[in-house]
Amino acid sequence: MKILILGAGTVGSTAAESLSEENEITVVDLNARHLRELQDRLDIRTVEGHASHPRVLEQAGAADADIMVALTDSDETNMVACQIAYSLYRTPVKIARIRAVEYTARQELFTPKGVPVDTIISPEQLVTDHIEQLIHYPGAHQVLDFAEGRVRLVGVMAKAGGPLVGQELRQLRRHIPHTDARVAAIYRRLENNGEDEARYETILPQGDTVIKDNDLVFFLAARKDIRVMMSELLRLEHPVRSIMIAGGGHIGFELAKRLEGTNRVKIIERDPERARHIAERLKSTVVLTGDAVNEGLLEEENIESVDVFCALTSAEEANILSSFLAKRMGASKVIALINRPSYAKLVEDQYVDIAVSPQEITLSALLARVRGMRLDVGQVHALRSGAAEDLEAVAHGDEKTSKVVGKAIEDIPLPPGSTIGAIVRGTDVLMAHHDTVVEAEDHVILFLTDRTQIPSVERLFQVSVSYM
């Protein structure tokens, strides 16, 4: 496919890298240096210029593009670019990142007769959803939905005291005989050797794999079984009651609005005007005007009794500092918005319990839409700074036209570093075992430790030309 990406920032660059294996990619940006850096490491075409100017879009090939993805830092530029691509070039699929709630709250704007955006990606909405899931499952590092939430991929840091820690995986069935779950991958921290950045070994587990203390374990389970499986890997934490949020922007405000009915919520916001604005719109949340890196303020507000401290400002350095301070002063758990993978790797596990990457979450939503052009895909989630992916693919065809339908999982030629974790068949959730047979229209949940194998998975699920 021919894909036109507008914006060579973090998300645009990562999207170009993720999609360049089997697509013709053109990236447009005003920054010549960013474009040169991309061309030096990827086989792509670049065009320097303003992303919403017709001349630039024409030069970039908008008339021939199958998909245009508008990922610049400006909502207005992204929307205008989609309008021009539709009006002048009839580009078939137009995807835009739109941050401002003032736009996304008015869905009636986004129609062919209005602003012709086919898919809106709203980072603020996606990040809020993600953090809400983490708070709902104390102890989880990631909670990702598949098959409309019937199956979830959960990442948990295994801790001594969990019944399965120190045991072979084959013992899982004996521990919880009435619960079916599948460990999809394990990331094991390697010896530091004086390096600042932690490195991990990737393990595709077998029955004799032993889970160790501090392993990051990703498992798949039906939604109803998540807590049972988590209890095998660590001592379950008590439900979250007290939450403190640093930053009253869109994410902090929306998260407080969702949680204040069931939790004690406080927001610390530096801007007095913004603090007044959100205080008027929240019911029981306590809104404080001040700086979250003010040790006296945190002490006064009893930071030591806070179950979860969320650093959600737009400045990741401030998020890191306030997280470090909150953790040192006794907050039970700290969640921080951190965009740069290099920052996240440095601080996670030491000063921040969970680093949430808006770029990675945005990329997941984008990949799901783009992969769906080649393959019938329900969900795609980027993991480990985009190095790994978990995806939901629908098996079409029959035994004659499909490479997967009618075959047991052990007989499916999966690419290296990939595994099938679960199958959703209608309303039933089936954990994948070696003799599980894939049927037509099954939703197959795959885990890939190496995203470069995605094209191989796409070919595996394609049906032959005789399929109608």
What do these predicted ranges mean?
Residues 1-468:
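Cytosolic regulatory regions of ion transport systems
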